[in-house]
Swiss-Prot record:
Disruption phenotype: Mutants have impaired capsule integrity as well as reduced surface hydrophobicity. Mutants have reduced amounts of surface localized proteins and glycolipids, and morphological differences in the capsular layer. Disruption of the gene is associated with reduced ubiquitin association in cell infection and attenuated virulence in the early stages of infection. Its main location: secreted. The keyword Secreted applies. GO terms for biological process: response to host immune response. It comes from Mycobacterium marinum (strain ATCC BAA-535 / M). This is PPE family protein PPE10. The gene is PPE10.
Length: 488
């Protein structure tokens, strides 16, 4: 280190760091371990040399024996170099331990530094009229001396430890000098067949790969191609899983970018592949873009069975519909729009132009009708209670059945003035032709068609007559009201 950090650290920190560690014990243990390894390697060299010499000098002769002996000689040379390296490591570890012990002895005790600082605080707190100034100066001088002693001890320790470490030969250099190649081309690779730097495993090409057969950088797994992949068989960058093709995929067998799931095709998909088609869909059976739910087609739909754009609900078609079975820009249930002027209606079970039955256009409510449309329960806009001024006359049987109050047009579409097949009348109509409920017409009768009261003997037509009042004819209608006649 050019400028060790301990040079500007106070003695409180340097002393505490030196005395807080385990001391020279680990270094001495390492030196002993390296020494033991050196002895074992030297013994292995001696034993292997003896065995190979016996083989090549007696029972094993010929070219194969010579080839084996050449390789064995290299191996014995490596064992000898390793033994020497281990012995040197043991010696340097012992030197480093000695340097630490020397530095520790030269370092000021932490308790002494703490006492100095405590006394300084007391003197400064009781320095009335400057009486403690000389003592404070002495305490500060002693503190500065402690600082210098700690820095000197650490500097000496740093120099000796650096010299001991620089004397060690790297193990990679020892193996390279011996001519032994075990497939580690590059630097700091661990394994076989690696090419690059920082690879751990086998047959990796690139840098910082963990696993086998990776091509690229920072891959973890097997057979990845690209960078920062985690898993197996990924092609691209930043994939997590198996067999992904693209970048940023999480799962298995995804093709695209940013997919999360299994077997997805496209970008930013979520779910299981084969169920959705398009981009940005979430759910099952969606086609298009940005759909959420099931069996939607189009763009931006949310729900089930929607078609179009920006719909939410069930079975909507068109754009921006909300509810169940609605059309464009509608909300509610079972709406349909066939004209540009029919948008934005809200009802329950309403229909569009030329609708017949229980509903009609531009109506809100339940089972209503309007605009010259007739329904199953209500007649048209100019309906039952308003008579028609120009009702055409039509012949009808004299004994026709009475027309009920709910009689309506027979055709699917009625005119604006209440016209049907023959223009039926309203609830009560004085006109000729087909009559209403009470009609004094000359053609088909209503429920009671006679304009005057019937005689008791002529029951069955007109308005029934009571025998409670005296029998008066039409000419007597202007007479005064008389008391009823008593009959026995």
């Amino acid at each position: 280190m050019t400028n060790p950090h301990f040079a500007w650290l106070p003695p409180e920190i340097n002393s505490a760091l030196m005395f807080a560690g385990p001391g020279a014990g680990p270094l001495l243990a390492a030196a002993a371990a390296w020494g033991g390894l050196a002895e074992e390697l030297a013994s292995a060299v001696s034993s292997f040399s003896s065995v190979t010499s016996e083989l090549t000098s007696g029972s094993w002769l010929g070219p194969s024996a010579a080839a084996m002996m050449a390789v064995a000689t290299q191996y014995m040379a490596w064992l000898g170099a390793a033994a020497a390296q281990a012995e040197q490591a043991a010696a340097q570890a012992a030197v480093t331990a000695g340097a630490f012990e020397s530095a520790l002895a030269a370092t000021v005790q932490p308790a002494v530094v703490t006492a100095n600082r405590g006394l300084m605080q007391v003197l400064a707190a009781t320095n009335w009229l400057g009486f403690n100034t000389p003592a404070i100066m002495d305490i500060e001088a002693a503190y500065e001396q402690m600082w210098a002693l700690d820095v000197a001890a650490m500097a000496a320790y740093h120099a000796e430890a650096s010299a001991a470490a620089s004397a060690l030969a790297p193990w990679k250099q020892v193996l390279r000098n011996l001519g032994i190649d075990i497939g580690k081309n590059g630097q700091i690779n661990l394994g076989f067949g690696n090419s690059g730097t920082g690879n751990v495993g086998n047959n990796n090409v690139g840098n910082n790969n963990w696993g086998s057969g990776n091509t690229g950088s920072s891959n973890v797994g097997t057979g990845n191609t690209g960078s920062s992949n985690i898993g197996s068989g990924n092609t691209g960058n930043s994939n997590v899983g198996l067999g992904n093709l693209g970048s940023g995929n999480v799962g298995f067998g995804n093709t695209g970018n940013g997919d999360f799931g299994f077997g997805l095709t496209g970008d930013h998909q979520f779910g299981f592949g084969g169920f959705n088609s398009g981009s940005g869909n979430v759910g099952i059976g969606n086609s298009g873009t940005g759909n959420v739910g099931f069996f939607n087609s189009g763009n931006g739909n949310m729900g089930i069975g929607n078609s179009g754009s920006l719909n939410s609900g069930l079975g909507n078609s068109g754009s921006m519909s909300t509810g169940f079975g609605t059309a464009s820009m509608s909300s509610g249930m079972w709406q349909s729009m066939h004209g540009s002027d029919m948008a934005s209606s809200t009802s329950l079970a309403s229909s569009a132009t030329y609708a017949t039955g229980g509903t009609a256009t531009l109506s809100s409510g339940i089972l209503s009708s309007a605009l010259a449309h007739t329904g199953g329960l209500n007649p048209a806009l100019a309906g039952g209670l308003t008579p028609t001024a120009a009702t055409p006359a039509a012949a009808a049987p004299a004994a026709a059945a009475p027309v009920a109050a709910a009689a309506a047009d027979a055709g699917p579409v009625s005119a604006g003035a209440n016209s049907g097949s023959t223009a039926g009348a309203g609830l009560r109509s004085p006109a000729a032709g087909y009559s209403g409920l009470y009609n004094s017409a000359n053609s088909d009768a209503g429920a009671r068609s006679v304009a005057t009261r019937e005689a008791p003997a002529n029951a069955g037509a007109g308005i029934p007559r009571s025998s409670f009042y005296p029998n008066r004819e039409t000419a007597d209608s202007e007479a005064d009201i008389q008391l009823p006649l008593r009959t026995e």
